[in-house]
C-alpha cells in the first residue's frame, strides 16, 4: 500500500502515521474491511477532496483534510467506505450514485460498529440517506458535485 502525503493538503509525517493507524484499526477490528482495502486499493493519498479515484493506477483513495482531521475511527470507516467503491468498480458494478452510496454507507456503519466508534459517529451514519454525493441537489452525480466537495 502506497501512502502519499502532499504538503498542499496534508503534510507528512502526520499523514502517513494516522493513515497507518487507521489501516491497523481495520486490520485488528474489521478484517473484511481491511482485506477489501489492501486487496483493491493500491494507494491512499492526501488530496483536496476525498473519494475513490478510479482514473489513476493503482486505484487510489483520496483523503481531504476535513476527513483526515476527524477521529481515527471515522477516518478508518471512510477508508472502508471508499474501498467498497473500489470493489464495486473492479467487479464492474455501479460505483457511483444513490444505490452505490447507500451500500457504502451501510458498510461504513457496520465497520464503525466493529471498530468501536463513538456512538455519535454511529448515530450520524445511521441518519445518512446516501445522497451526500449530490451536493447541487439535481438528482445526479456530476463534476459540479465533485468540485463542491469540502470533505
Residue ranges of each PLM-predicted region?
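Extracytoplasmic/secreted proteins, especially bacterial periplasmic and envelope-associated proteins
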Residues: 18-21, 74, 78, 99, ...
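Flexible, surface-exposed loop/gating regions in the mature catalytic domains
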Residues: 91-95
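Short pre-active-site segment immediately N-terminal to the catalytic Zn-binding motif
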Residues: 62-78
Amino acid at each position: 500500500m502506497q501512502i502519499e502525503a502532499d504538503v498542499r493538503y496534508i503534510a507528512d509525517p502526520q499523514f502517513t502515521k494516522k493513515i497507518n493507524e487507521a489501516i491497523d484499526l481495520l486490520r485488528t477490528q474489521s478484517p473484511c474491511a481491511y482485506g477489501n482495502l489492501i486487496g483493491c486499493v493500491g494507494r491512499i493519498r492526501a488530496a483536496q477532496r476525498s473519494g475513490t479515484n478510479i482514473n489513476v493506477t493503482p486505484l487510489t483513495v483520496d483523503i481531504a483534510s476535513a476527513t483526515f482531521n476527524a477521529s481515527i475511527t471515522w477516518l478508518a470507516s471512510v477508508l472502508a467506505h471508499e474501498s467498497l467503491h473500489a470493489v464495486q468498480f473492479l467487479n464492474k458494478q455501479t460505483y457511483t450514485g444513490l444505490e452505490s452510496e447507500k451500500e457504502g454507507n451501510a458498510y461504513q456503519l457496520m465497520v464503525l460498529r466493529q471498530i468501536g466508534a463513538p456512538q455519535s459517529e454511529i448515530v450520524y451514519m445511521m441518519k445518512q440517506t446516501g445522497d451526500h454525493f449530490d451536493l447541487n441537489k439535481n438528482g445526479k452525480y456530476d463534476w459540479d458535485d465533485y468540485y463542491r466537495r469540502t470533505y
